[in-house]
Amino acid sequence: MAPKAEKKPAAKKPAEEEPAAEKAEKAPAGKKPKAEKRLPAGKGEKGSGEGKKDRAGRKKAKKSVETYKIYIFKVLKQVHPDIGISSKAMSIMNSFINDIFEKLAAEAAKLARYNKKPTITSREIQTSVRLVLPGELAKHAVSEGTKAVTKFTSA
């Protein structure tokens, strides 16, 4: 909401004295104060602390969006240190990983339900990888997953 314009006092009475701080802020009686330049609503300076606010007047917390972008970049640098990736390609890779994750999680949940187990273990994940991914890709994924689990449990 935009701040309301200040009202000028109608007529000053001689008996009334204002503090020195207030006198310094006000413009001389004969001149109009210059209009301040305002930025569009919600676009304050970076360090000003002004931002979007909710109905109660509190500052809205920025929603964190979790992505795999940093991990994709780390793997890319391990495999091809001299090659970069565009933001569009990074977005596609992030969507791809989210899609595979959802497929594996759904399949693992089905397997746990079929076996009447309340917990998804590494066994359900391994079976879902074999069911979702094709041939050689599934074999490599299972071996890498097994290696990661043994490294995690031994550490």
UniProtKB/Swiss-Prot annotation:
Q: Where, if anywhere, are coiled coils annotated? A: none
Gene3D superfamilies xrefs: Histone, subunit A
Q: Which sites are covalently linked via Glycyl lysine isopeptide (Lys-Gly) (interchain with G-Cter in ubiquitin)?
A: 151
Q: SMART domains attached here? A: H2B
The domain of life is Eukaryota
Q: Where are the transmembrane segments?
A: none
Q: Which residues carry this modification: N6-acetyllysine?
A: 7, 37
Q: Name one Pfam family in it.
A: Histone
Q: Which UniProt keywords apply?
A: Acetylation, Chromosome, DNA-binding, Isopeptide bond, Nucleosome core, Nucleus, Ubl conjugation
Which residue ranges are recorded for the region named Disordered? Answer: 1-63
Here the segments flagged for biased composition (Basic and acidic residues) are 1-28, 36-54
Return the InterPro entries for the record.
Histone-fold (IPR009072), Histone_H2A/H2B/H3 (IPR007125), Histone_H2B (IPR000558), HISTONE_H2B_site (IPR055333)
The known PTMs are summarized as:
Can be acetylated to form H2BK6ac and H2BK33ac.
Assembly, in brief, is: The nucleosome is a histone octamer containing two molecules each of H2A, H2B, H3 and H4 assembled in one H3-H4 heterotetramer and two H2A-H2B heterodimers. The octamer wraps approximately 147 bp of DNA.
Reported function: Core component of nucleosome. Nucleosomes wrap and compact DNA into chromatin, limiting DNA accessibility to the cellular machineries which require DNA as a template. Histones thereby play a central role in transcription regulation, DNA repair, DNA replication and chromosomal stability. DNA accessibility is regulated via a complex set of post-translational modifications of histones, also called histone code, and nucleosome remodeling.
Provide the family line: Belongs to the histone H2B family.
**Record's protein name:** Histone H2B.5
* Taxonomic source organism: Oryza sativa subsp. indica
